[in-house]
Amino acid sequence: MKNSRDVVVVKYGSSSVTDEHGMDAQRLSAYCDEVEQLRRRYAVAIVSSGAIATGKAMEPGRSLQTPDENFAAVGSAEAFIAWQKELRKKRIASGMVLVTNHEIESEEGGILRRRMLSMMNDRDDGIVPIANGNDVLSKEGAQELRIDTDNDRLAGHIAELLGAKHLVLLTDMPGVLNSDDEVIKHVGVYNVNQTLALARERQIREGGGGRGGMHSKVKVAYEASHAGLEPGFAHIAEATNDLQAVIACRVGTHFAPHA
């Protein structure tokens, strides 16, 4: 199945969608305004973190020794419903998609692709897939996603599966910063190693762990812009930015396609 419109995959990190009380409805509402505008031209798939943080907010009295998988079990439905509620206000239908490495890397990836494209091509104005790594059921696979790049890698894989025109990784930074704290506007073969080194140094200096830091975002974005038969653009930008401006390369850091 081929999508009738170009696909955009937008990934929101946990810090962009949650606060101390769980999913942040006010910010989600603003993001959904952006999604509504974007859908006038593109088919949109969302990758959203936040299940674990939401579970912890819902169960504040639980021991710190409680496994993250348990918090994800508590929070995953609530996180999706928060998105669904705000999208429904825009008369946009949405559906939850929980994914593991197995479904992406095995032949089942084709099934996942067809299912997501079927949702986006639904005759009644499409359904927006809201994907998340299945932290509850996946052991080795989902844990690998979390330790390495959180949902960044998942978003990159989904963008490749769907043949997306754009992959947008949204964060709390204006883009990838150089040593002078200026946004690096474009990353390609000529400067990717230097950009990776800068992102790694900053992540270590600021105490960032191994989950979804800027280094991993740069790696995922660069790989995504080189992946597939029809590589697409990848972008890293601040979640508060206008998505149209990000896709038009007016704000953030951008990775041009190169087969």
Cite the ranges covered by each PLM segment.
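C-terminal catalytic "cap/lid" subdomain
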Residues: 1-259
